[in-house]
Regions:
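Boundary-proximal intrinsically disordered activation/regulatory segments immediately upstream
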Residues: 1-67, 155-156
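Short acidic-hydrophobic, aromatic-tinged amphipathic segments that line or gate anion-handling sites
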Residues: 3-10, 79-84, 175-186
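Short, aromatic/basic amphipathic alpha-helical patches
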Residues: 66-77, 239
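A glycine-rich helix N-cap at a beta->alpha junction
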Residues: 74-93
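RNA substrate-binding interface of SAM-dependent RNA methyltransferases
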Residues: 107-209
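Active-site/ligand-binding-proximal alpha/beta "capping" segment
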Residues: 202-253
Length: 274
């Protein structure tokens, strides 16, 4: 393991941490060269457990023989760039989460069909662009038994830095895939693929034809896809029209909606396979 003391972040090797945008890190033109950033020893360890390849670390000096020692022992070939906390804060402009960042190679993408052959309960996300919500949804999906998460092409990347952090690494534990290559593939193309895989689809939406989330018919479905929409407007009408069910969560005190991550958690628990 090579440890390099730094005094500035202008060297090209540190560009993933300091200069590259999320889009540049993802590298859509050459996805095999894509990178993501994992933060904190716990999240980095979860990514390593999932087989992700570490490229380098940026961390406070005290982390090397402290909380990061365990993950560093698993990455003997990775370069570690280090400095004191005060230096890193000045250079990066923010405090590192738990003092450790790791640049890692993006895993090879999978198709929905590869992931969902034996799945019984999956989450399908439409147009969710808030990375905090993406991370929270993945954490709920992992905790509450979803077999996979599928995303419309307009969703935020689950491997963007904040989504990875908020998910507490569960983006590496729950299989996920994007339903199509462009927004034009959703909803018609994506819904057709879900139905071809044998899923009944349940749109979480306020609608006159909506059934309650505790409707017995939902629990009898062998393969059910729970479809969640954007933070503001929810699912588009065309998506709802393509779904087999429209489902609502009964609420009290005049509340008519929940944050999408909270609504997802309720739906995942109530509609889990039993």
């Amino acid at each position: 393991m090579q440890i390099i003391e730094i005094t500035d972040l202008s060297i090209p090797e540190l560009a993933p941490y300091t200069k590259l945008t999320e889009s540049q890190l993802r590298n859509r033109l050459e996805p095999e060269k894509g990178i993501f950033i994992a933060e904190s020893p716990k999240v980095i360890g979860t990514a390593l457990d999932a087989g992700c390849e570490p490229l380098s670390f940026l961390m406070e000096r005290r982390q090397i023989d402290g909380p990061a020692a365990g993950v560093l022992a698993r990455c003997p070939d990775a370069t570690v760039y280090t400095a004191d906390r005060s230096v890193l804060q000045v250079l990066t402009g923010y405090v590192l989460t738990r003092g450790v960042l790791c640049a890692m190679r993006r895993p090879a993408p999978h198709t929905a069909e590869e992931l969902c052959g034996n799945a019984h309960r999956i989450a399908v996300l439409e147009g969710i662009v808030d990375s905090t919500n993406i991370g929270a949804i993945f954490r709920g999906a992992a905790a509450l038994g979803m077999d996979a998460v599928l995303l419309s092409p307009s969703c935020c990347d689950p491997l963007c830095r904040r989504a990875v952090r908020v998910s507490m690494g569960t983006v590496f534990q729950v299989p996920w895939a994007v339903l199509g290559d462009s927004p034009a593939d959703w909803p018609e193309g994506g819904m057709a693929r879900l139905h071809a895989m044998g899923f009944k689809t349940a749109a979480m939406a306020l609608d006159n034809r909506a059934v309650s989330i505790d409707d017995p018919a939902l629990h009898t479905e062998d393969k059910l896809a729970i479809v969640l929409g954007t933070e503001g407007d929810g699912l588009v009408h065309n998506t709802i029209a393509h779904c087999d069910y429209t489902v609502m969560i009964p609420m009290q005190h005049g509340v008519d909606s929940l944050n999408v991550a909270a609504a997802g958690a309720v739906a995942f628990w109530e509609l889990r396979k039993r």
